[in-house]
Amino acid sequence: MAPVARQANVPVIAFSNDRHVAGNGVYLLGFQVEPEVARVVGYVAQRGMRRFAALIADDALGKIAGANFRQEVARVGGTIVALQTYPPTANGVLEPMRAISTQIRSAQEGGAAIDALFVPGGQENLEIIGRLLPQAEIDTDKVKLIGTGGMDYPNAGRDAMLVGAWYPGPDPRGWNEFAQSYAKSYAQSPPRIASLAFDAVTLASALAGGGEDQRFTPAELTRAAGFTGVDGAFRLLPNGTTERALAILEVQQFGAGILDPPQSLGLAQPPASALSRAVNFD
């Protein structure tokens, strides 16, 4: 689709999070893992936690997360003490988890304990990891679990082993208001991707009021003022990726708690009442 749209000089707003398809008229609204890794590693390092272990799926997302994890740990002056990858199968993670556990215990016994265990991914692999943490004898009271935005799924807090984990994501209050309004109107919960669809419509609406020759031009799409949607402030960049204001969240038994509010992008934030009106489906 992108080549056809490019020939017609029509920009494409994609829900993808694969930055390899960004650019040349394609702009990604999806949450990209690279800034998420930078946000969570930076937050942890600010709290004096600089010795890391990582358990990463050997898949496309894992490769991106792993490469950026190495880069960000080096940037903050940290050390990756242990790193294991695992095949994305139901039973593939147990042996790598046991290996990580052994390395964590060895570091503790050697007087240089590991501070945080990085486990990027989403619900499918995190539920498996959560179930296996006790078998692998990894004590999450001593080693802080950290992840990416994939931890932001319903009922993550039902798994006691994931409670207390830290991850980056948008301020959940915008999504909660959106989901409540959606459920009231349609008697069902919205899929998580619905916020991206809503934000895409919001973006289009914001730009549609300009002069006909100015609508949806690269300059307007990447305007410094950015946009504000259900998932907070965001700015489209000339390379097709998206800069977002990400908070640091903590998995709690019921929902997520905000540990560190979204970092400012220098964009004006609308009052909560404005967002509430915007997501009214009645």
Outline where the language-model segments fall.
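Extracytosolic ligand-binding ectodomains
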Residues: M1-D282
